[in-house]
Amino acid sequence: MLNLLIKLTLSVAILFYNFSVNAACMKEGDKVVLSGVMKEELFYGPPNWGEERQHDEKLFYWILHLNSPLKCVNDANTERDGWDSNVQLIVSSEDYKTKRNLLNHHITVDGNVMLAVTGYHMTSVLLKDISFKPIE
C-alpha cells in the first residue's frame, strides 16, 4: 500500500511540474514585449531558395536579434539554428517607410507571437501586429 501511495505521489508531482513548465512557455498568439537590435537581412526565395542565388528572388526582412534568448515557445521549430535569438518582424508597409531609421539600433517592440509556417518565414518565431515602443 505504501508503495502505491509513493508512486501516486510521484506521478502527481511530475504532472504538476509538466504543467508549470508549459505555463511559462510562450505560445502562438501570446502578446509579448521583446528587445534587441533590428537589422534588415537578405534571404533568397523562389524558385530555388538560395541554391541558385543569381536566379532566386531576393527577399529583405527585418530581423530582431534579441537581447535575451527565448526560453520556451510551444510548438516552435527548435532545431533551426538561432531559433531562440532571432525573430522575424511582420512589419506594416507604413512602418517599413517610417521606421527605417531604427534599423541597426536597439529597439523594443510588442506584438503577437507567430510560428513559422511557410518558406517566407525565415525564423522559427515571428512577431506580428507589432508596435514600436519609445526608446528609454
Where are these regions (language model features)?
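N-terminal signal peptide c-region/cleavage motif recognized by signal peptidases
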Residues: 18-20
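Mature extracytoplasmic domains of secretory-pathway proteins
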Residues: 56-82
